[in-house]
């Protein structure tokens, strides 16, 4: 059986949903195409789940296309930007990432939340929302239901942050620099960071958008050490501390992601415009949308809602802790 005859129907279903989701995401950037894709897929699940000819293509899209998307995501990351954000913001970034991951670990231990779901919510909250979840899910062998739950939780707090952060920043009397750091570290998804920073700029005729975006992209670089650690940890669990294979400890798609980041950094330093990588970054985003479509089509919405109470609570705790941490660190280093 050829690849197309085996996978074509499922891939086509994901493609059609993704085109619609991409279009809707353009009109509602705070929500974003990946979230639309998951929810459209889940709404269609009861009607399409009986069509078994879709299964192979959905599995390919939710697994392989997601890995390809992560590799291409590397072309949007310039490692030299870590140094561009300056010494003042790196302590805030590292503190917020650390506190969210620690909370996720403790929460799953004390409240009996599924380890993989807690991990996805933790990395999504602390690093870069859907992109971090997309990179982490294949590494820890997360189920489609767990990915959908984590994305949904992150989406809720993204939208909430985009709506209330400009007002909260005004109430707290944050400076322009302080709000850029606040939005860049306490909002997960790039589109929501953009929405919050743009709203602030409209209020105060400032230029925080670029600074907030750089902080956000610097957070994204944490995907590299976090996924490598989780891959090693997952391999130890599966192998029961026996001899490990390098391919299992360091998945090839993560290594390719790192190489793509290094290549981007090198070429940019040699004078290549960042716009050169734009088509690859856009393709990465679209493949993530296709993967989310597949995950949605394989997820039972009713069952997910019934079991999502603890994950929402974890997302709320992580979100509040990140807000308090970034404000506290800004106070300590004299920005706030």
Curated annotation (Swiss-Prot):
Transmembrane segments: 65-84, 91-113, 118-140, 153-175, 211-233, 249-271, 286-305, 312-334
Main location: membrane
Pfam families: Cons_hypoth698 (PF03601)
GO cellular component: a single term: plasma membrane
Keyword hit for Heme: no
Keyword annotations from UniProtKB, A to Z: Cell membrane, Membrane, Transmembrane, Transmembrane helix
Protein origin, superkingdom: Bacteria
Entries under InterPro entries matching the protein: UPF0324_pro
Membrane protein topology class: Multi-pass membrane protein
Compartment(s): Cell membrane
Family as reported in the entry's similarity comment: Belongs to the UPF0324 family.
Protein name: UPF0324 membrane protein SP_0034
Source organism: Streptococcus pneumoniae serotype 4 (strain ATCC BAA-334 / TIGR4)
């Amino acid at each position: 059986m050829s690849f197309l005859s085996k996978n074509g129907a499922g891939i086509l279903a994901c493609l059609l949903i993704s085109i619609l989701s991409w279009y809707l995401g353009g009109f509602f950037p705070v929500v974003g195409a990946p979230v639309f894709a998951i929810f459209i897929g889940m709404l269609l699940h009861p009607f399409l789940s009986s069509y078994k000819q879709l299964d192979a293509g959905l599995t390919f899209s939710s697994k392989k296309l997601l890995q390809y998307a992560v590799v291409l995501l590397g072309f949007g990351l310039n490692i030299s930007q870590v140094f561009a954000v300056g010494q003042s913001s790196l302590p805030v970034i590292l503190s917020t990432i650390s506190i969210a991951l620690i909370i996720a670990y403790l929460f799953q231990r004390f409240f009996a939340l599924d380890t993989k779901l807690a991990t996805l919510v933790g990395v999504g909250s602390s690093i870069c929302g859907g992109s971090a979840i997309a990179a982490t899910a294949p590494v820890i062998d997360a189920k489609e239901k767990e990915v959908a739950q984590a994305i949904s939780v992150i989406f809720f707090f993204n939208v909430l942050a985009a709506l209330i952060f400009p007002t909260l920043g005004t109430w707290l009397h944050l400076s322009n620099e302080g709000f850029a750091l606040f939005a860049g570290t306490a909002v997960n998804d790039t589109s929501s960071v953009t929405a919050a920073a743009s709203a602030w700029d409209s209020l105060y005729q400032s230029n925080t958008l670029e600074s907030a975006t750089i902080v956000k992209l610097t957070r994204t670089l944490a995907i590299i050490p976090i996924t490598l650690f989780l891959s090693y940890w997952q391999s130890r669990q599966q192998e029961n501390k026996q001899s490990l294979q390098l391919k299992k400890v360091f998945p090839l798609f993560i290594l390719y992601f790192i190489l793509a980041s290094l290549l981007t950094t090198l070429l940019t330093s040699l004078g290549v415009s960042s716009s050169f990588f734009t088509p690859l970054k856009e393709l990465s985003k679209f493949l993530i949308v296709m993967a989310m479509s597949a995950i949605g089509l394989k997820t039972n919405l009713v069952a997910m809602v019934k079991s999502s109470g603890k994950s929402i609570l974890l997302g709320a705790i992580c979100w509040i802790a990140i807000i308090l941490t970034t404000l506290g660190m800004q106070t300590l280093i004299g920005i706030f």
